A protein has these predicted regions:
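Conserved Class I SAM-dependent methyltransferase catalytic core
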Residues: 1-52, 64-68, 234
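C-terminal substrate-recognition regions of SAM-dependent nucleic acid methyltransferases
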Residues: 50-216, 223-296
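Short, amphipathic C-terminal "tail helix"
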Residues: 297-303
Length: 303
């Protein structure tokens, strides 16, 4: 609709959903990036709570009044944030950061379909894409009865959702792809749908998973560590206000998919880190503020 309006007028002012400004939502990523790179496009006003403008309406990610002028150059937005303070913090953090935590984020575990169908061909009807999708989907505990409540020898404990509740089930390791990136490692698992997208919102109930523990599409896994101590350090980082602020650069809906973690800097979670992970989360926040040379005003904004 926006593209069509730009074809028929030099100057276009619109009010519309804002999720694409954060490279989120259902619009194609290529289109999002095109809009954010358009020097003729700018934001006049942004409102995170759409119900303030459209009563009794919930528009995830808020709404924006945008202006496009083919005859003027405003400069590309590139990265849009709700707050000018957050954009300044992002610029400062990424002036010295080179790696994002998204590099250690992994999607759900997978079946070994060859082994599964050899012994249980009837399971093919419960697998997506006509039996070709090997991933542990959200409803897999219902679709595949091989996930059991009781643990048996060589079974893999799997975290998922059953009847709307977080649940652990067990499946024989023979039916699982054991080459998944973090199956044999320590990791932190969090719900894929988490909160509402409000700034700095606490991420609900992250848990540490041990080696040979898995998770369904209802969750994402962060890390692939050799030691539990590293996973514990990551868990503290996830609970920090600093991380939650950096996550808010792109997280404006409930989804915590890999892409929204782009501006969260990766840390060294070992004992050799420049952060002392043995400290409390409050003290870890202070260390992170010092590491990135944040001002008193920037710290107050995050806090």
């Amino acid at each position: 609709f926006l593209d069509a309006s730009y074809e028929i007028a030099d100057k276009v002012e619109m009010i519309h959903p804002a999720r694409f400004l954060f490279n989120a939502g259902s619009t194609p990523k290529a289109w999002n990036e095109k809009m954010l790179s358009d020097p003729n496009f700018k934001v006049l006003d942004y409102e995170a709570d759409a119900s303030k403008l459209f009563h009794d309406t919930d528009i995830k990610g808020g709404v924006v009044i945008s202006y496009h002028d083919r005859t003027k150059t405003f400069g590309a937005i590139q990265v849009f944030t709700k707050y000018k303070e957050l954009n300044a913090i992002r610029n400062k953090v990424w002036a010295s950061s080179t790696e994002s935590i998204m590099e250690i984020i992994y999607i759900q575990n997978r079946f070994n379909l060859t082994n599964l169908y050899r012994k249980h061909p009837e399971c093919k009807s419960g697998i997506g894409s006509d039996g070709r999708d090997s991933r542990f989907e959200k409803n897999i505990f219902v679709k595949i009865p091989l996930f059991q409540e009781e643990k048996e020898d060589n079974s893999i404990r799997t975290l998922g959702i059953y009847n709307g509740k977080r649940t652990w089930r067990y499946i024989d390791s023979e039916y699982v792809d054991i080459d998944h990136e973090n199956l044999k490692k320590y990791k932190v698992v969090i719900p894929a749908a988490n909160g509402s997208g409000e700034f700095g919102q606490t991420l609900s109930t992250p848990v540490i998973e041990m080696p040979m523990e898995a998770y369904t599409r209802s969750f994402i896994g962060i890390g692939a560590f050799n030691t539990k101590e590293e996973a514990t350090a990551l868990l503290k980082y996830i609970k920090s206000k600093f991380l939650r602020a950096m996550l808010s650069v792109l997280k404006v809906t409930q989804m915590t998919n890999k892409d929204v973690w782009k501006y969260v800097p990766l840390q060294d979670f070992t004992a050799h880190s420049d952060i002392d992970w043995s400290k409390s989360v409050v003290e870890i926040d202070r260390q992170l503020y010092r590491k990135y040379d944040l001002t008193a005003d920037e710290i107050e904004f995050i806090e």
